[in-house]
Amino acid sequence: VIFDVLRNWLEHQGLRVRLVRNITDVGHLTDDSDDGEDKLLKRAKVEQLEPMEVAEKYFWSYEDAMTALGVRRPDISPRATGHITEQITLVLDLLERGLAYESQGSIYFDVSASEAYGELSGRDPADLIEGTRVATRSEKRDPRDFALWKAAEKGHIMRWPSPWGEGYPGWHLECTVMSTKYLGDEFDIHGGGLDLIFPHHECELAQAKGADKPFARYWLHWNMITLGGEKMAKSKGIVIALVELFKKYDPMAIRFHLLRSHYRSV
């Protein structure tokens, strides 16, 4: 809703806006580090569906809810699974520049070699040591390093061929690739929830700058909707589906309610 208002205002000012909203249909693991299970695969097992069936189901459910709230669709909705070649190309570029390394069929971004890492969140990379939401994997040189490409384990359904064997892209990689493909190496605004500043957006920026892409000029982060004092999240079972709210309240009333507060307030 926030981005819809911003888009409308910018267009009202006479500016031409291209809005891109990516669809993460592979690579988003259940842990912010490089451990855990792909969220889409996990959901597919629960619902006994193919991963792409799950992606389609929730994509259209989300689109229907946004339409009810009066949110216009983006100009482009690229999917991570449709941009595997471009993601491999960026990994090869970062390897050539000495900003990444291969380990057991996976490729990791070398945080120690990046001048940009920590720039967005204001965190000192040296302070990110073991035990601070950074998992230690034996195949990493440094626990702070993050996956660009993951080797597919036996039985992993979503996998693609690559120069390093079959695998799948890391969560951060796809966003850097798709945003720069459709908006250029430098674009105006990148947004998301406050919880994405670190590590997700931090990693996106490090990847982009590592490939000499200036990336976003401005960052817009909004706060989370809370329920009982906790952030609403499916992973914690703290969630109310919009479709359920629509049964009780007019969607425009919900839109108005969401816009009553500053976008960074709780």
Model-derived segments and their meaning:
Residues V1-L205, K209-H221, K234, P251:
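NTP-dependent nucleotidyl-transfer catalytic core
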Residues K213, H221-V266:
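Catalytic adenosine-cofactor/nucleotide-binding cores of aminoacyl-tRNA synthetases and other
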